[in-house]
Amino acid sequence: MAGRVKIKQKELIDSTVKNKNVMNLFHEIIGSKGNINFSVVWPKFKKIKQSVYDYISTLSVLEKASVMQNFEDDKKLLELFVQKLWAAYEGYFKYPEIEKYEVEGQVNFNLVPQYVLEKFSQLYRIRINSELVTLILNSCAFMSKYNDYILKKDPYILTITPGLCFSPIPNFEDLNFKHLYNSDKNSQHDKDFIMFILYKLYTAALGVYNAISIPDIDVEDLENIILSSVSQIKKQIPRCKDAFNKIESSVHLLRKNFNTYYSDYVGSGYNPTIIMEQYIKDISQDSKNISPRISYQFRTIIKYYRDMIATKHQTMDPQVLNLVKHVEKKLDMLDREKN
């Protein structure tokens, strides 16, 4: 039954490709034009939200813990900081619109009002790129340098790190774990508790990082888009069979390297063309035996796209233009290697 669903899904994509500009469809799948795949993005958003909540809650537990009674000034500063984090959390993450339509953790998005989906789409990128999430990701990056020690709750980390301060939160050096841990006022139980808090803070930050790293799209849908578009275009461009076969046979590289492509996509400011750039680059690097004939066929395919755009009197998207230039540059390099 599952196989049949996949077949129907591919048939739908094939039909859609016939009736839509391929690049527009690619943009839609990626979500760069405001369209997002709710079945993928909503679970991702929930994981980010939960991990952000866990991160702030950990700091809140520390602030209220008896051990902080020994550090009155630090306690007051931490209390104010936690209040600011909770206020930011309320502003970015307390939007129960879609949650109201959940049944046993699942959402039928066909039953969610369009205005609710549109509002979530508009705010999604703002939320995951917020100062709050960025702070936690920076905190994670700092602690990841000491991954093994923190996960083992090994206090040796507070000895080997240079300086008098070990603060895992950017721009908040008042939370100094060296100062807290090394105080003569602490019992061994207090010291163990402080290391446990550091451990919980790191695992929560890792949760945010891991959730953020989840692609916003279904990779299989993207593969089907590429294969279906190639299937349509090859009928209109004769004598380029070898180049098309190379593209079709290399789709496995998309799935294999997609996590890297997606990281580049996020790092580029959500430029979807970067995925195709890296994909084509990998095809060329994986194809050391591309002949001048196949190189010529690739150029013919590129020319087809240019002519199609010119015929329709459309201005080429700068991102698409960069992609075309990148492919041509790669082909030039391959040609030079052959000579």
Curated annotation (Swiss-Prot):
Its main location: host cell. Keywords: Host cytoplasm, Host nucleus, Host-virus interaction, Late protein. The keyword Transmembrane helix does not apply. Coiled coil: none annotated. Induction: Expressed in the late phase of the viral replicative cycle. One of its GO terms (cellular component) is host cell cytoplasm. It is found in: Host cytoplasm; Host nucleus. Interacts with host NACA (alpha chain of nascent polypeptide-associated complex). Belongs to the asfivirus H339R family. This is Protein H339R.
